[in-house]
């Protein structure tokens, strides 16, 4: 029997999704087509993998770190030509299927303990593109992470992550997932989210993206402080004030009160200011 005797490993963040209704919602959110090539991070025991293959997609490529699960997955899907499997850490190994043709979608119940760095690898970061441009990512993540990704300005969950990801992808929620939907049950709720990475012509200029990343990181390190107290690490207050005024930015606000595009406007002003100083 595949997976007989395997005990979920806490250090790998293993929780098996066993709720068919949630699996169906994930498939629906992925908008699967016959020509789709799917990357699945951490297929585990293969519950989602099986549903993906039943959807008649062209290929499902799994990346799994747990050597015991690799054995079970090979047994479960033996003879399935549309399933390929790679052993390794999704943060470091190549994510390309064996034929070298990249997947176009990511559908995964990703381990909670690597969510942040894995998102950066899959979507890229401000000022740097990802290795592969995916059309859509449908991910099951910890609810607290989903709240930060989807948060609006002024909400307590609005963070540097909110700004970065909302400038890189269109983000939306699919559904909340109760702990009882998993075995073993996690201590927290989860959420299924959709991330549609922006097309190249929708992305900002990379210099502006890098500037946004820099000022957002500095500002949110002191999220309780007003912008006039944090951004002076970048630009003297007497020069910062007219820059902010031109964009209608109130420097008495705190970082979580500014929408992503306001950060972009501020970044552009600071880019111009920086260039003027170098002349």
UniProtKB/Swiss-Prot annotation:
Tell me the domain of life: Bacteria
Where does this protein hold S-adenosyl-L-methionine?
15, 17, 42, 64, 89, 109
EC number(s) recorded for this UniProt protein: 2.1.1.182
Top EC class per UniProt?
A: transferase
GO molecular-function annotation terms? 16S rRNA (adenine(1518)-N(6)/adenine(1519)-N(6))-dimethyltransferase activity; RNA binding
Q: Matching SMART domains, A to Z?
A: rADc
UniProt subcellular location: Cytoplasm
A GO CC term assigned to this protein in UniProt: cytosol
Keywords, comma-separated and alphabetical = Cytoplasm, Methyltransferase, RNA-binding, rRNA processing, S-adenosyl-L-methionine, Transferase
Its main subcellular localisation, reduced to a broad class, is cytoplasm
Recorded catalytic reaction(s): these are: adenosine(1518)/adenosine(1519) in 16S rRNA + 4 S-adenosyl-L-methionine = N(6)-dimethyladenosine(1518)/N(6)-dimethyladenosine(1519) in 16S rRNA + 4 S-adenosyl-L-homocysteine + 4 H(+)
Annotated family? Belongs to the class I-like SAM-binding methyltransferase superfamily. rRNA adenine N(6)-methyltransferase family. RsmA subfamily.
Q: Which PANTHER family match?
A: DIMETHYLADENOSINE TRANSFERASE (PTHR11727), DIMETHYLADENOSINE TRANSFERASE-RELATED (PTHR11727:SF7)
Give the protein's function: Specifically dimethylates two adjacent adenosines (A1518 and A1519) in the loop of a conserved hairpin near the 3'-end of 16S rRNA in the 30S particle. May play a critical role in biogenesis of 30S subunits.
Which protein is depicted? Ribosomal RNA small subunit methyltransferase A
Q: Which organism is it from?
A: Prochlorococcus marinus (strain SARG / CCMP1375 / SS120)
Q: Which taxonomic lineage is given here?
A: Bacteria, Bacillati, Cyanobacteriota, Cyanophyceae, Synechococcales
Q: Which gene encodes it?
A: rsmA
